[in-house]
């Protein structure tokens, strides 16, 4: 009986949330996918950051920082540490990311945070595109939606605008669709 109890107590720490793996795209159009591992310690840091938020607006501010940190840690394990904001500053370096890479990877990172219960005021939505002259899709971004009654406001979480490891740009979806965002 005591041996069984000892074995159960020894296994107890392993019953918590384990390290997580996420595929991060790069090379333009998700040509390359790196398997990135986030430790319990790193995810605990992100959890504490997000749980410091007192409302949805504050959660978006913390989420911008969290996405930047997650990309920085991914850059320690892959070539994406070379990625620069926009497309023009990348040059021919390995690890460059276009908006398809960013929107796909950021949506995966947001999904990880949602699955762990770290997003209290937002839910993850599908990737959105904005178009040039209302015809040709020209830019894609990850999207979150505020958890509210009635018409829920949506926001883009756009890491494409910034260098690797910097806070993501979070804007109202409607403004982003009209071209809002840093000039890169």
Predicted segments with their positions:
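Short N-terminal segments immediately surrounding and downstream of signal-peptide cleavage
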Residues: 19-35
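Low-complexity, Gly/Ser/Thr/Pro-rich intrinsically disordered linker/tail segments
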Residues: 179-184
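N-terminal, post-signal-peptide region of Sec/Tat-exported proteins
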Residues: 42-76
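Mid-length scaffold segments of soluble, non-membrane domains
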Residues: 67-122
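N-terminal signal peptide c-region/cleavage motif recognized by signal peptidases
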Residues: 13-15
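Hydrophobic/aromatic-rich core segments of domains that either
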Residues: 111-176
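Second-shell loop/turn segments in exported
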Residues: 32-33, 49-60, 85-100
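Bacterial N-terminal signal peptides that target proteins for export
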Residues: 1-6
């Amino acid at each position: 009986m005591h041996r069984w109890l000892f074995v159960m107590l020894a296994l107890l720490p392993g019953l918590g949330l384990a390290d997580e793996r996420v595929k991060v795209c790069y090379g333009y159009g998700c040509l390359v996918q790196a398997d990135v591992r986030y430790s319990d310690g790193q995810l605990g840091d992100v959890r504490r950051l997000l749980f410091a938020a007192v409302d949805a607006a504050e959660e978006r501010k913390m989420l911008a920082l969290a996405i930047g940190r997650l990309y920085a840690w991914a850059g320690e394990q892959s070539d994406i540490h070379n990625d620069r904001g926009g497309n023009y500053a990348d040059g021919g370096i390995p690890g460059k990311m276009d908006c398809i890479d960013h929107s796909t990877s950021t949506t995966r990172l947001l999904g990880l945070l949602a699955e762990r219960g770290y997003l209290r005021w937002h839910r993850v939505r599908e990737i959105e595109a904005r178009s040039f002259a209302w015809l040709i899709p020209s830019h894609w971004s990850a999207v979150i939606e505020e958890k509210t009654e009635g018409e829920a406001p949506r926001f883009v979480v756009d890491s494409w605008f910034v260098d690797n490891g910097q806070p993501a740009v979070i804007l109202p979806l409607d403004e982003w669709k009209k071209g809002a965002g840093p000039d890169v």
